[in-house]
Amino acid sequence: MNVRQKIGTVLIILAVTFTVYLSVIMIRRINAVVLKAAYTKIFCYELAACAFFILFALDVRFGFTGAEHQVLKVAGWCLRILVVLVTAVLLFFIGKITIGSFICTEAPAKNAIVLGLALENGKPADDLVSRLDTAEKYLQRNPDTTLILTGGNPDESGRTEAAVMRDLLAERGIKEDRLMLEDQAETTKDNFRNTARLINPDDPVVLISSNYHMDRAVQTAQSAGFSKILRLPAPSSLISFGANVMWEVMLELDGLVFGK
């Protein structure tokens, strides 16, 4: 076995392992949320992306262009070019989102927006709790700031993400006159559109969301008219970070291709 074949073998193991890891996390989430159809659609996109990673690894290991027959050789080259291009696009977005997760430009502001996250079995997910932890600490540092809690997706009982966040912050002693709800929107884009009607989008605003979500959240906020965005990423689980980044990649590509 030569060096290329050894590298290909390692890549195959990594690609298959990542696919299994991603599948375990996503299947658990799909079973826990109300928005099963939306989550299942993105999961299918993720599996397609993983298939390209596996094909890339197989090409490195076995070589798609090694066939003796000319037709098969041309087909091998076409497949290789497609796989390499798709893999390069995926890696570009993975890198962009990962780098964006580390950027923090926090500063005092009149308003701060906390983005919601789908409830799991009627309870806030760990990453949503982390967003609230980050928001609470920011409020303590900035006593004049108003917090806009967004998220209109209800659980099975009808409670929205925004309402759940308000109740949790109230339990922590945050006064309700410092909290404003945007509980009508079911997408991040509509969250910002509705919030732009509640506050002046030309004023500086702090954006609080999970670190892996910041890249897409900032782009969406800018498209809704917010021009002075201060980024405050909330830490997320290291175990599921890879799956979350892949989720964001699929949503960004979905937006680019279908304009959503």
Description of each model-found segment:
Residues A75-G100:
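Short coil-to-helix leader/linker segments, especially the first N-terminal amphipathic alpha-helix
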Residues N2-I12, Y39-F43, H69-V83:
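Membrane-water interface of alpha-helical transmembrane segments
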Residues S23-V33, L91-I94, T98-S101, L256:
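Transmembrane helix-loop junctions and nearby membrane-interface residues
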Residues K6-G63:
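Membrane-embedded alpha-helical segments of integral membrane proteins
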Residues F92-W247:
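A structural signal for short, hydrophobic/glycine-enriched beta-strand patches
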Residues A49-V84:
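Cytosolic-side transmembrane helix boundary signature
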Residues F18-L22, V86, L90-F93, L251:
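Helical transmembrane-bundle signal
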Residues F241-K260:
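A transmembrane-helix-recognition feature enriched in membrane-embedded lipid enzymes
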